[in-house]
């Protein structure tokens, strides 16, 4: 990651290069960097954890995220790419809004910047936390040390290489995430054997029957309510307003590359979300002696 920061730093010749990669991102980098930064630790830890704890009904969240992703690429991406150039070649979302609506008093740019800063402090904190936990579990390092190391590495390559470094590292992470969600289910099935998955689920301390646990239309042993489905689907609404995703649309090279990005991103998200849910179920079968408590996961 640090090497990517050093290499991309040499390509930054102007502020447009530093903040938007010179609007020259290729289709694959645009797609995977957008989706990797979007899904991040949530897809690797949060979604499988929800399915592990509460059952397949949590897949409605994944469905909502998929719908939101598709709408974002189909409705927002192309228009934002075109209009940010027309609106004074804007390099940030606040600048685009200000230029697009001819805000001479900088009211829009101020409000949008404040909103982004406030909410992204929380969002970034959760991303750093999930990264720290993952790094700590892999290296056996103390969580706080892992958090600091991860944060320092991210800050260094971001300051060195700017937007291009961020997108390149996110592209690499997107490939690694895809390999991970493909490999884990295969390895679990090999280790457990197909005949042991359902018996392990039955013996894993479920609060409901295994068939209800595996049914997306059942929640707590009863048919899932429309409100629960709607609230989970609503997770996808946020995608059309996430600045760190939208800025990728602004930076793609041209409309042709954007069309390629759309296809790659949607396929990546579909595969990754489905497998993340599968990992949650298989994880319950594989780790069935482990139960959830207020202090975290423990073995009984």
Predicted regions and their residues:
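Short, Lys/Arg-enriched, Gly/Pro-containing loop segments at transmembrane-helix junctions
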Residues: 14-19, 85-89, 196-201
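Helix-loop-helix junctions that connect adjacent transmembrane helices in secondary transporters/permeases
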Residues: 52-160, 244, 248-300
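Loop-to-helix junctions at membrane interfaces in multi-pass transport proteins
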Residues: 23-25, 29, 46-63, 98, ...
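Membrane-embedded alpha-helical core segments of multi-pass
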Residues: 1, 68-76, 116, 157-161, ...
């Amino acid at each position: 990651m640090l090497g990517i920061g050093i290499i991309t730093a040499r390509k930054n010749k102007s502020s447009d290069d530093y903040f938007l990669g010179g609007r020259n991102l290729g289709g694959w980098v645009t797609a995977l960097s957008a989706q990797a930064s979007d899904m991040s630790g949530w897809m690797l830890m949060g979604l499988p954890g929800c399915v592990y704890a509460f059952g397949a009904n949590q897949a409605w969240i994944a469905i909502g995220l998929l719908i939101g992703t598709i709408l974002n690429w189909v409705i927002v991406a192309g228009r934002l790419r075109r209009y940010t150039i027309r609106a004074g070649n804007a390099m940030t979302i606040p600048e685009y809004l200000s230029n697009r609506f001819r805000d001479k008093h900088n009211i829009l740019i101020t409000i949008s910047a404040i909103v982004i800063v406030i909410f992204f402090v929380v969002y970034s904190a959760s991303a750093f936390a999930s990264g720290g936990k993952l790094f700590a579990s892999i290296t056996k390092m103390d969580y706080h040390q892992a958090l600091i190391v991860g944060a320092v590495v991210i800050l260094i390559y971001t300051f060195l290489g700017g937007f291009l470094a961020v997108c390149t590292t996110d592209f690499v992470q997107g490939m690694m995430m895809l390999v991970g969600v493909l490999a884990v289910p295969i390895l679990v099935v090999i280790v457990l054997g197909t005949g042991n998955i359902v018996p392990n689920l039955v013996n894993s301390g479920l609060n409901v029957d295994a068939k209800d646990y595996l049914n997306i239309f059942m929640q707590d042993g009863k048919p899932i309510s429309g409100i629960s489905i709607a609230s989970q689907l609503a997770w996808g609404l946020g995608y059309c307003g996430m600045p760190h995703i939208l800025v990728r649309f602004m930076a793609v090279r041209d409309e042709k590359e954007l069309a390629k990005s759309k296809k790659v991103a949607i396929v990546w998200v579909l595969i990754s979300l489905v497998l993340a849910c599968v990992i949650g179920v298989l994880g319950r079968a594989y780790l069935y002696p482990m139960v959830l408590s207020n202090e975290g996961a423990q073995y009984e």
